[in-house]
């Protein structure tokens, strides 16, 4: 494992260095990053220890606190682009109704996480934190099964800085089951025998609506930290179209009800994989799914407003939000390599006005 067995529970320095390297690469490309404790609570893998049904909760909590103290301290200077999530799919390994005693152990771990991060210095006092309920299941987080939002008395942000974390893989027969039984979903389905008996669009809508009513409306953002559907196109030529529609509907209703969805790309691009890109070459392998997602979120970069508000037939003056100065062509020259500077301006001129040209992918140049 990557955590020492002695009472200090020291995380392997090479491992933590690699995590930081990846975080830095992401932030350098203006991405948001979520660090979580992923899989430590699985009963199905070697090395699992973060068990909500474990007999020695005192030792588990001590190890958990020590790990998050190290992580939070290492990243204390990072800004809002870095988010911490307490754990991933934590449950007792069975898929029935949650055991309330074990659920309370999850609540206790979430509280330890919040308290530890908040008192670890730097920006941690105001960092966004993600908290999952039982197995990141929507019903078991929204319903009366035992989930409790932790107190956050050490937050200095002047407002809530806790997000709720859930996953969405419904219906599982279509989304994750490695079989050829359910290969279609939604209005694109052309063979009813290939459609699961539950988990249709109306169910999806009701799930996200429940998240809004329970959390978003109370000031707690919701992140759908994982969703997706595995590739079964080798068995059904209509599978890709159905997967694309599924992605579109998840994003559409997430947007409507104030949630942020994240496709689970596990790097596997073959049969039964969730991957959208080839991670060795960077090549897109699922353009229809990517297009379905980006069609719901057409804006890009740090723009305020949608791309539909940009008139490509008009010219614009570009004002820097920090300096209040405008982008201006140095000396009004019209040759390649001419520098662009900041300059005060009272009216539009040829050297300080610009056109936006769409690249066809939701961006402009």
Language model: regions and residue ranges:
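Active-site mouth of glycoside hydrolases
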Residues: 1-128, 132-143, 270, 284
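N-linked glycosylation sites
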Residues: 6, 56, 139, 153-154, ...
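Residue-level detector of anion-binding/catalytic polar loops
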Residues: 32, 221, 260
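A mature extracytoplasmic/lumenal domain signature
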Residues: 37-39, 88, 135, 226, ...
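Extracellular glycoside hydrolase catalytic/binding regions
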Residues: 66-69, 73-81, 90-257
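Aromatic-rich peripheral "rim/lid" segments of glycoside hydrolase catalytic domains that contact
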Residues: 234-309
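Lectin-like carbohydrate-binding module/patch detector with strong preference for beta-trefoil
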Residues: 305-365
């Amino acid at each position: 494992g990557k955590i020492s067995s002695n009472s200090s529970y020291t995380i392997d320095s090479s491992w933590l260095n690699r995590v930081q390297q990846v975080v830095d690469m992401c932030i350098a490309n203006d991405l948001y990053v979520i660090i979580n404790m992923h899989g430590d609570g699985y009963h199905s893998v070697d090395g699992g220890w973060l068990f909500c049904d474990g007999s020695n909760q005192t030792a588990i909590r001590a190890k958990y606190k020590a790990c998050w103290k190290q992580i939070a301290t290492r990243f204390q200077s990072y800004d809002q682009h870095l988010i911490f999530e307490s754990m991933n799919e934590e449950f007792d390994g069975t898929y029935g109704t949650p055991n309330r005693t074990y659920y309370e152990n999850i609540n206790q771990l979430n509280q330890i996480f919040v308290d530890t991060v908040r008192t670890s210095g730097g920006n941690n006092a105001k960092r966004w934190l993600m908290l999952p309920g039982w197995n990141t299941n929507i019903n078991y987080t929204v319903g009366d099964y035992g989930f409790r939002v932790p107190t956050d008395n050490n937050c200095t942000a002047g407002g809530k800085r806790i997000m709720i974390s859930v996953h969405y893989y419904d219906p599982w027969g279509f989304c994750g089951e490695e079989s050829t039984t359910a290969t279609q979903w939604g209005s694109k389905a052309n063979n009813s025998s290939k459609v699961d008996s539950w988990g249709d669009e109306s169910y999806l809508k009701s799930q996200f609506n429940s998240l809004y009513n329970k959390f978003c409306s109370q000031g707690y953002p919701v992140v759908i930290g994982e969703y997706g559907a595995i590739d079964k196109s080798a068995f059904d030529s209509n599978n890709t179209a159905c997967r694309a529609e599924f992605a579109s509907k998840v994003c559409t209703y997430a947007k409507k009800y104030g949630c942020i969805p994240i496709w689970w790309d596990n790097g596997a691009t073959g049969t039964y994989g969730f991957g959208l890109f080839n991670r060795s070459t960077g090549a897109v392998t699922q353009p229809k799914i990517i297009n379905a997602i980006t069609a719901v979120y057409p804006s890009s970069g740090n723009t305020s407003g949608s791309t539909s508000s940009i008139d490509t037939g008009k010219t614009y003056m570009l004002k820097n939000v920090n300096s209040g100065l405008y982008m201006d062509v140095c000396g009004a020259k019209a040759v390649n390599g001419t520098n662009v500077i900041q300059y005060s301006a009272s009216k539009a001129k040829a050297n300080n006005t610009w056109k936006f040209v769409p690249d066809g992918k939701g961006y402009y140049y």
